[in-house]
Amino acid sequence: MIQIKNAKELDGMRKANALSAAALKYGGEHIEAGMTTWELDKLIYDFIVKHGGTPNFKGLYGFPGTACISLNDTVIHGIPSHDIIIRPGDIVSIDTGAKIDGFNGDNACTYAVGKVDLEAQRLLDVTKAALYKGIEQAVAGNRIGDIGYAVQSYCEDAGFSVVREFVGHGTGRELHEDPEVPNYGHQGRGPRLVPGMTIAIEPMICQYDCKISQSKDGWTVKTKDGGLAAHFEHSNAILKDHTEIMTRFWDDPDFDPEKFSLK
């Protein structure tokens, strides 16, 4: 069932997503070649806890980390590890969130470590742009399929492919709520968007074929062909006259997570 939030609940969602976005940007700014993904995860954990939140990924369905940290051909759900070292030229996806006062935030961004090749950079640019194409369609009166169509058509026109097995979702008191928000679809199909809905839109896009495989750890999802993958995500509130990007801080060049405060 789709949960419609009232004004007080929307304020709670804004707070949780502000912290989530600040933590994501903090993590992104501290990525360094030579560090392990476990070290990066610990930085994000400490940031969330310092600001009064709870890392909402940690322990969810048994996931061991504060963030899913996915490198190169890992699409999503990379487990932070002492054994995975970030290297120059990698692309690193961070997907993380915080819970505070009973509400959940969720967001993701894929970062380039130093200089990456032109095709890797194009994948990042297209996937990020596709996120905003989807958000443009996430307005009251439109349907879920309008979002998916916008993401899919933009990415496929650029020569990339869209993961089918994992999708965006509603957010709220639970991290994952109805409705599902696929990154593919048909215009005018699916549930209608109404004010008070809060949804996470998160394109997961592959450089080549969209076929994926899950590792033996039960979490890590990789491209089958070894091509790169990128993942970007914003949590959004559908309002009467516009849509609010609640996790906008991670993509604000003027936002300094070191100065972040919920007070």
Language-model-derived ranges and their functions:
Residues 1-263:
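Active-site neighborhoods and metal-handling regions in enzymes and metal-associated proteins
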